Amino acid sequence: MAMPRYLTEPAFRHDYAPKTGVLLINLGTPDAPTAQALRPYLKQFLSDPRVIEIPRLPWWLILNGIILNTRPKQSAKKYASIWTKEGSPLLLHTRSQAKLLKGQLGEMGLHNLAVDYAMRYGNPSIESVIGKMREQGVERLLLLPLYPQYAASSSATALDEAFRVLSRLRNMPEVRTVRHFHDDPGYIAALAAQIRKHWQYGQRPDKLVMSFHGVPRFTRDKGDPYHCECQKTGRLLAEALQLRPDQYVISFQSRFGRTEWLKPYTSEVLEALGKAKTARVDVVCPGFVGDCLETLEEIAMEGKETFLSHGGGEFRYIPCLNEDPQWISSLAGIVRNNLAGWTEIRAEDSQQRAALAHDMGASA
């Protein structure tokens, strides 16, 4: 059966109160830490041409013939190790961030807003949340991917999906996007404060590892600014913490496949620090605003094991910003700046519009 050209939308009415929407978009998570739940999630994720840039036919054969028959079970074990009674950490943190953001914006005097969150892969989907926002009367929409550093495989694909959904609306809202916030002063200050807070409970480390999610190296060579933006975030964070160049290192994690990715690899950095008998290492992941599999399992568990098993001393993982009040305040500042000129929509405007329309014979 052919898919309808347009999505179902509420009937147009002159008397509805128009709102401005803010949609936070994160990567996503499976519905459960099981192989059954991981298979459709991984299929959606790894079928994205923004994520895997190789010819479609050979990749389809590899994905469906090999990866989806082996990786779901392996990944399920990793997810199970971080899953909480309430569910996926990433989902919980993103949901809380949206709720806290709405409250913070309200304290700034921005009340006529619909603030929500969606996932690029998995649930809640971008399509379902944009549909809900349209039902709430959203006619101006700010899309904010929760990736501080722009990359085609993260920020761009989130916006791709949002635009795909918007292209299927008859009554399309005005749209703005937040491309990145890697050098936003509030974001950097929140990161620095999070690290200083951690250091209050113990000695400063001999080395601070700033671990960012990796991407294939060829993407940098083809114009993706991600590597540069990670380096700038790291430099600004080091300056805020007054660190010398020998006191920190910027590295990249989560390599997938055999292609060369951005270097140095976090796993190799931790191994080398262990072999050097480094007494204390702290790891922070500035590219993630909410703790997830890549931070809680790959770094806090696997990274720790790598460092200790190669002779390292004390390993400490510094949590992501999550629900930190300073981070929520800085996020609200980013939103407010990008909503400039949009928040003047008033309920009275819709009432006046409806009255005038009815005078001219409108029935709704």
Curated annotation (Swiss-Prot):
Disulfide bonds: none annotated. Fe cation binds at H213, E294. GO terms for molecular function: ferrochelatase activity; metal ion binding. It catalyses: heme b + 2 H(+) = protoporphyrin IX + Fe(2+). One of its GO terms (biological process) is heme biosynthetic process. The keyword rRNA processing does not apply. It is found in: Cytoplasm. It is an enzyme of class 4 (lyase). Keywords: Cytoplasm, Heme biosynthesis, Iron, Lyase, Metal-binding, Porphyrin biosynthesis. One of its GO terms (cellular component) is cytoplasm. Its EC number is 4.98.1.1. InterPro entries: Ferrochelatase (IPR001015), Ferrochelatase_AS (IPR019772), Ferrochelatase_C (IPR033644), Ferrochelatase_N (IPR033659). Pathway: Porphyrin-containing compound metabolism; protoheme biosynthesis; protoheme from protoporphyrin-IX: step 1/1. Belongs to the ferrochelatase family. Catalyzes the ferrous insertion into protoporphyrin IX. This is Ferrochelatase. It comes from Chromobacterium violaceum (strain ATCC 12472 / DSM 30191 / JCM 1249 / CCUG 213 / NBRC 12614 / NCIMB 9131 / NCTC 9757 / MK).
